[in-house]
Amino acid sequence: MAHQPPPNRGGKVSRRDFLKLMAAAGTVLTFVPFVDWGKFLPNPTAKVASRAKVELADGTQANVKTFPVNSSKAVIYPKTDDPTLNKESFRTWQFIRLPEELGGTKNDISAFRMYSMVCLHLWCLWKYWPDPGRKRGECPCHGSMYDPLTGKAFAGPASLQAPPSNVLARLDLEIDSSGNIWIKPPNWSPNGNGIVGYGRFLRE
């Protein structure tokens, strides 16, 4: 009778199985940059043809003349007529007017940012904290922190992830002659506005 190797006890992985696992992981990581993640991750929509209002929770449109410096509001985008759809995390964005030291007192579009609120680590919802000594985005689940100027994670588990999964998806904004703020049609790709829950390559 042929000698049989002893069973693998205690859930330990043999050296051979470990090497096989590492080889498989390496193969997967090789192709990650070439995957069209927009087809797999739940983004709000494939295309948005026209600009949309930055609509606040009270139904008013954000305006450069009235929105306070160093403050933020959650905004739904793209908004639908279905209240259930509008509750989806992947439609929730943090609209921020930067603090004074980051240019928030300017009455132009450079004073504003709009990032997906879906944390890039495990998809909890982060928020902006305007308190002295903070003035950053913080995820309550595992402590990832985001720079309000760029959307890049600078602390916590999201900051340890490789690009583009360390920078939040961002919407481009514009201001009309009345000071009302609008969202430009996005390009849902890592090299464009990013992919919600996956990230964005940071433009230099």
Please give the residue ranges for each predicted region.
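His-Asp-centered metal-binding catalytic motifs of divalent-metal-dependent phosphohydrolases/nucleases
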Residues: H121, H142-G143
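N-terminal secretory signal peptides and thylakoid transit peptides that target proteins
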Residues: Q4-G26
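Cysteine-rich micro-motifs
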Residues: R136-H142
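Disulfide-bonded cysteine motifs in exported proteins
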Residues: M114, R134-R136, F154-A155
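N-terminal pre-ligand scaffold of iron-sulfur
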Residues: K20, P33-P132, L171-E204
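Short linker/helix segments within small regulatory modules
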Residues: P130-R134, P163-P164
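Short Fe-S-cluster ligation motifs
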Residues: Y146-P190
